[in-house]
């Protein structure tokens, strides 16, 4: 049975209170594609690795999509009204401004595919840590990987330059 159309603007107004940290992300449909509305602000330091493409449509405000492009860190600004198709297998870290709202569309993963979360040294861009896993639910599969990385000073210390990657405030007791 077909689902009825969604009035996206009305959906956003009704759910705007959910599009804030710490999650800021709500899946509105999932049937072949994962269609999410994502609000800012956020302060992610991880890079997401997806074996498929991702489509970004910035509805309100702006964002910067940090990417690792052939070993070089780059910033791609995406402003309200703009769309961007990220090719498969490009590590990316969406940085959303306060009050911003975007639509992100990813295809559902094939049974053989894995997602990844990666962290790079903010000083020298050396890859610090990578975890690959089959993605079932973006809202529940990411947090254990975040916890593993941020709770471990060993994982966060760069083997190239010795810099300790900062952890979010909620992990502050790990370093104390």
Curated annotation (Swiss-Prot):
It catalyses: 3-hydroxyanthranilate + O2 = (2Z,4Z)-2-amino-3-carboxymuconate 6-semialdehyde. Its cofactor is Fe(2+). Substrate binds at residues 54, 96, 106. Fe cation 2 binds at residues 121, 124, 158, 161. Its EC number is 1.13.11.6. Pathway: Cofactor biosynthesis; NAD(+) biosynthesis; quinolinate from L-kynurenine: step 3/3. It holds the Pfam family 3-HAO. Keywords: Dioxygenase, Iron, Metal-binding, Oxidoreductase, Pyridine nucleotide biosynthesis. O2 binds at residue 44. Fe cation 1 binds at residues 48, 54, 92. Homodimer. This is 3-hydroxyanthranilate 3,4-dioxygenase. The lineage of its organism: Bacteria, Pseudomonadati, Pseudomonadota, Gammaproteobacteria, Lysobacterales.
